[in-house]
Design a protein with these regions (language model features):
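Secretory targeting signatures
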Residues: 1-30
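Non-catalytic macromolecular-recognition regions in eukaryotic signaling proteins
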Residues: 20-284
């Protein structure tokens, strides 16, 4: 009996490690991991029937959910890889984010495409993928520090830390922003460069511009103290990271100035998922 129990436990362990408990697509094919971790995520992509047969009309569906902190707007999906798939763009609804304070989860939606399986005389397996695009917003806040010459000397003498930027916080979104300054800032300085670093952290891609051949961030609005700056069409190198520099004047109202900075970044984001569909011959 102990040997039988041990055997069951070992089989269960192998199943867990191999990932065989993941959802399956139509025709018994294991579904690939879904992209999208901060913003929209794809919960499931595949056919709406478990056993597609030759010539059958079926729906391909993508179930999506907003797990970020902003409203997902202009949601749309497009099928790729599948030669007999639909070329139509499926439009989705705007999806609200979760609200933990009231215990509300992020909104979900379902994108569907009606297709007809090909005629087959033996079981054939096809690759199919979906791109889901949406507009999203990242909100970033931080504090920039500046010091007078007197305060700077005092801190050096006391061997105290002299911060440049602190408390950078990004909303739960697929693009994050880092705030960097090259040198310790002095109060009363003018035309000081502040570098914003945009990072793709969501498992997908920002919009691709066919004219410039770059992935781009549409725009970023930067509020620093009482001034508002902006950047637009920010290229993302390799789709992973982009830069924008804004210039600001530092007031000299005190020996230590703390400048709040708020960055609102707007962009289109795309996530993708792929699976396999097995089409079987008709029953005789």
């Amino acid at each position: 009996m102990n040997k039988e129990i041990l055997g069951v436990l070992l089989v269960s362990l192998v199943v867990l490690i191999s990932g065989c408990t993941m959802p399956f697509g139509g025709g018994g094919e294991k579904q690939t991991a879904m992209a999208g971790t901060q913003g929209l995520t794809i919960l499931y992509f595949g056919p709406d029937v478990e056993y597609p047969v030759s010539g059958q009309s079926i729906n391909l569906e993508a179930r999506i959910k907003n797990v970020g902190d902003a409203v997902a707007k202009n949601v749309e999906g497009e099928i790729y890889l599948l030669s007999w798939g639909s070329t139509n763009i499926a439009k989705g609804a705007d999806l609200n984010p979760p609200d933990p304070e009231v215990g509300r989860e992020g909104e979900e939606d379902r994108l569907t495409w009606r297709v007809e399986a090909p005629k087959v005389t033996k079981t054939q397996t096809y690759d199919v993928g979906v791109h889901v695009r949406y507009n999203y917003t990242t909100t970033t806040v931080a504090t920039i520090y500046a010091f007078s010459r007197t305060e700077y000397r005092k801190r050096m003498e006391r061997r105290e830390p002299i911060p440049k930027v602190k408390n950078i916080v990004n909303s739960n979104s697929p693009v994050h922003v880092d705030v960097r300054v090259q040198n310790i800032l002095r109060t009363g300085s003018t035309d000081v460069p502040i570098t914003l670093v945009f990072k793709n952290v969501g498992g997908g891609n920002v919009e691709y511009n066919n004219n410039t051949k770059h992935y781009i961030i549409k725009r970023a609005t930067v509020k620093i103290g009482d001034s508002t700056k902006g950047c637009s069409n920010i290229p993302m190198k390799g789709g992973r990271e982009g830069y924008c520099t804004v210039r600001v004047d530092i007031p000299s109202t005190s020996d230590e100035v703390k400048l709040p900075i708020e960055i609102t970044t707007i962009y289109q984001y795309e996530i993708s998922a792929e699976t396999k569909i097995s089409v079987h011959p008709e029953f005789e």
